[in-house]
């Protein structure tokens, strides 16, 4: 069975990497999980603390769009970590691919 996998890469403003990771680990990822979003992996890049990745998995691209639209429209997100996260991001890149479930599970940390 295939999963739709979204890979987000962020270039963060200089000096915000540790703060960003704390917000992700303590607030954003638990919020994602409460909304039923499968966060496969996330963290700072090994080469630069101000580079970050977030990998999320979904049943299909349609499911991804529905779930993320609902999540980003929620008061939990808008009144929660949204501003702290957006303020740290200088640029972002999004890639969406289909992977076998076993490959997705291999990315989990």
Language-model features: where?
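Short beta-strand segments and strand-loop junctions that repeat across beta-rich extracellular domains
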Residues: 10-11, 71
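An amphipathic, aromatic/His-enriched active-site/gating alpha helix that lines ligand/cofactor pockets
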Residues: 22-40, 59-95
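Long, low-complexity, Ser/Thr/Gly/Pro-rich intrinsically disordered segments that act as flexible linkers
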Residues: 12, 49, 87-109
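Short beta-strand micro-motifs enriched in acidic
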Residues: 44-45
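Residues that cap or initiate secondary-structure elements
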Residues: 14-16, 60-62, 100
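Short, surface-exposed ligand-recognition loops at beta-strand->loop->(often short) alpha-helix junctions
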Residues: 11-23
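Short, structured motif recognition centered on aromatic/hydrophobic residues
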Residues: 4-9, 20, 31-32, 51-56
